[in-house]
Amino acid sequence: MPPISRGFHGRREDDADADRLPPGQYLTPDFPVLSAGPTPHTPLDEWSLTIHGAVDEAVSWTWDELRALPSETFTVDIHCVTKWSKLDTTWTGVSVDTLLEGVATEAEYVTAWSDGDYTTNLPLEDISDGKAWVAYEYEGEPLDPEHGGPARLVVPHLYFWKLSLIHI
């Protein structure tokens, strides 16, 4: 019996891009929507981002305050934990380094909370020194709630799973 059922051909990536894919990932031209729960739709006038916990003093930004911070546009490959990859995606957002300026902490790890109480833990070194952004635009357009809007944590060297960010 063949290892692959008849009619199933699998997914083949372009050989030119194969070296950009982690093992087991497949390329997609799409931006799949995969969620474990309902999609939050927080009105922008009610949204805020807060850094709190093991810090000397919590800091928060409203939507307008976040958008007023210096932003960067960056192009990265994204690789989702659900095995899809999309290459050369362009985002705009605020560097986590900008958000951490003036935040005194001895923490080595952070927890990122999404709207809806999903959390993920990360070493602080994975989101500092130019390695992560709080992105609010994708391909020049506001980030849709279905893709983590209004703002999501983008950490290009880690798998893509940090949606709809509200706390760090």
Language-model region placement:
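Structured, non-membrane catalytic/scaffold regions adjacent to prosthetic-group chemistry
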Residues: 2-167
